[in-house]
């Protein structure tokens, strides 16, 4: 059932200065109390003296505020507007006009309807200025809340989120009422539904029903087309159309286990329990800065289809603070059945609650006690990249930058070929210039953050390989350059001749470097100064205990050893 409270304006000559005082009307199931206006079946205005009117007034007349109520909350109506603010109200409407007898009659009718019917929402329509009405309503709430008489107070029941057979019957009953009140035949309705602008023609009706059922208008329009068997919709299962629009984001059992593992790790690092973690999630004043690290880690581990907003919503619902008595509220068999259903369906709480005969909130409150913790291997497997995933990632980056970067340069990056460059940043795209959300969506198995990190790791590895290859290339060139000078091998006779030259010059010298090598080069021009010095050093170092022996003595011993060898060796 839908209750609507309309605040409308009797128009006089289409000018704002001549507008009369607002009047109200309320309606339920087609019955209405008329106050100068007609409340139609699909919540639209039928204005008396319907002539030309300003565009701004037209726009304001179509505004609608929908209020959702929690159980046992009391709300007061005055002049057709809420005075006591509901916990999840979107906006408030009000008027500065004094309360009239008509207003009081409407308020009384509203109170009786809510007391006697399982209503779940109230629609308030107003044509007054939005900003001024909200301001007036807030001031009225502050000043008048305690002064409103108890006769103008009532309790409203909370809306159920799950799509049940009762909701389906209710929706079909509203469709039948629409046909009856509007005197529309079934054939005429089919003609309306076949029109591509059917949503606009039935906008008021769909808005009213959608606000009660908590479903999208497009989904309900599909339901109507399937119900009336409009061409192209005959084979659609009308029983599943509204259910497909589950308001809860679905997490698999493995996803839930990974979340539990990360949350427990966070609690361990922060030194808090799950109850305190729930307070941090539910209260912005207790929100801890390290929560961002928790979100980032979960986004890296969970599928790309799950947004940050979805993760936050899951954490708030599953880990909200609980009364200690709720810990053992369920039997062990019920908890096992809950685990089995989540394993089969994921976290589709509405469907699971129907099968367990309880509420979605109760299922969510107990889920933390049975989800358990995932193994470390599960998280490690989600973090690791396979060769196929890495190759696909690089191909996606390569294809997205094909027009901006030379193919050969990109190929050398992604295949790790021998490709030297003095400035790698000029050769490959920077990490912050890549649309990682698009890359992640195409890859399908990793989050945008994980893709970015893996790409940066690849760049770092490539840069390191490039530097090593460049260093090795320089060494090869240097060795090749030395070989090009015609370097010859030292035979025993050559080494003996070298040491004899050194022996004549060493005298009291204590180091090979103190020898006049330029003079020796003149005597042995086939070798360079560096080559002769290196050969002499090696020959002296071959003498046992040469470090503790005078240079002249070491040279003498080396000469003696060389003379015992064949000269052509």
From Swiss-Prot:
Principal cellular location given in the protein's record: nucleus
Ranges of biased composition (kind: Basic residues): 474-487
SMART domains: SANT (SM00717)
GO CC term, one of those recorded: nucleolus
GO MF terms, alphabetically ordered: sequence-specific DNA binding
Positions bearing Phosphoserine: 21
Pfam families xref list: Myb_DNA-binding (PF00249)
GO biological process: termination of RNA polymerase I transcription
InterPro entries cross-referenced by the UniProt entry: DMTF1_DNA-bind_reg, Homeodomain-like_sf, SANT/Myb
Biased composition (Polar residues): 9-26
Compartment annotation: Nucleus
Transmembrane segments: none
Key words of the record: DNA-binding, Nucleus, Phosphoprotein, Repeat
Region annotation (Disordered) ranges: 1-26, 133-159, 459-487
Official protein name in the record: DNA-binding protein eta2
Originating species: Schizosaccharomyces pombe (strain 972 / ATCC 24843) (Fission yeast)
Gene from which the chain derives: eta2
């Amino acid at each position: 059932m839908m209750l609507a409270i309309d605040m409308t304006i009797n128009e006089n000559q289409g000018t704002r200065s001549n507008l009369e005082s607002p009047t109200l009307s309320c309606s339920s199931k087609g019955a209405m109390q008329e106050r100068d206006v007609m409340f139609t079946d699909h919540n639209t205005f039928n204005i008396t003296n319907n002539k030309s009117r300003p565009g701004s007034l037209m726009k304001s007349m179509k505004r609608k505020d929908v209020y959702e109520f929690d159980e046992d909350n009391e709300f007061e109506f005055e002049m057709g507007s809420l005075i006591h603010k509901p916990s999840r109200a979107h906006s408030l409407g009000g008027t500065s006009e004094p309360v009239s007898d008509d207003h009081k009659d409407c308020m009384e009718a509203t109170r009786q309807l809510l007391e006697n019917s399982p209503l779940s929402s109230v629609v308030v329509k107003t044509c007054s200025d939005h900003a001024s009405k909200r301001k007036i309503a807030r001031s009225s709430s502050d000043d008048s809340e305690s002064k409103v008489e108890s006769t103008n107070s009532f309790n409203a029941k909370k809306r159920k989120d799950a799509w049940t057979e009762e909701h389906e019957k209710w929706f079909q009953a509203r469709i039948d009422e629409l046909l009856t009140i509007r005197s529309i035949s079934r054939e005429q309705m089919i003609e309306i539904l076949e029109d591509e602008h059917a949503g606009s023609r039935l906008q008021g009706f769909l808005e009213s029903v959608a606000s009660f059922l908590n479903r999208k208008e497009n989904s309900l329009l599909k339901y109507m087309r399937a119900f009336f068997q409009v061409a192209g919709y005959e084979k659609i299962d009308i029983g599943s159309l509204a259910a497909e629009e589950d308001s809860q984001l679905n997490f698999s059992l493995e996803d839930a286990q990974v979340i539990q593992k990360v949350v427990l790790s966070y609690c361990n690092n922060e030194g808090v329990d799950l109850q305190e973690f729930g307070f941090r999630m539910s209260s912005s004043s207790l929100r801890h800065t390290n929560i961002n690290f928790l979100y980032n880690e979960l986004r890296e581990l969970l599928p790309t289809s799950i947004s940050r907003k979805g993760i936050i919503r899951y954490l708030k619902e599953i880990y909200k603070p609980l009364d200690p008595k709720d810990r053992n509220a369920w039997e062990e068999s019920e908890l096992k059945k809950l685990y089995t259903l989540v394993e089969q369906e994921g976290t589709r709480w509405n469907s699971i609650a129907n099968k367990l005969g309880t509420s979605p909130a109760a299922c969510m409150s107990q889920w933390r006690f049975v989800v358990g913790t995932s193994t470390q291997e599960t998280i490690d497997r989600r973090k690791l990249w396979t060769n196929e995933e890495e190759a696909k990632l690089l191909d996606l980056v390569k294809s997205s930058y094909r027009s901006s970067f030379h193919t050969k340069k990109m190929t050398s990056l992604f295949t790790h070929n021998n490709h030297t460059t003095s400035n790698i940043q000029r050769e490959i795209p920077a990490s912050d210039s890549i649309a990682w959300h698009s890359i992640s969506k195409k890859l399908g198995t990793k989050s945008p953050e994980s893709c970015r990190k893996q790409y940066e790791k690849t760049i770092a590895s490539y840069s390191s390989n490039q530097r090593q290859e460049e260093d090795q290339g320089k060494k090869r060139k240097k060795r090749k350059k030395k070989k090009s000078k015609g370097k010859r091998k030292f035979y025993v006779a050559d080494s003996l001749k070298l040491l004899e030259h050194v022996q004549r010059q060493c005298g009291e010298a204590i180091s090979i470097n103190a020898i006049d090598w330029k003079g020796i080069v003149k005597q042995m021009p086939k070798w360079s100064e560096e080559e002769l010095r290196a050969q002499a050093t090696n020959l002296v170092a071959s003498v046992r205990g040469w470090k503790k022996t005078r240079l002249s003595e070491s040279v003498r011993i080396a000469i003696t050893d060389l003379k015992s060898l064949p000269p052509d060796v």
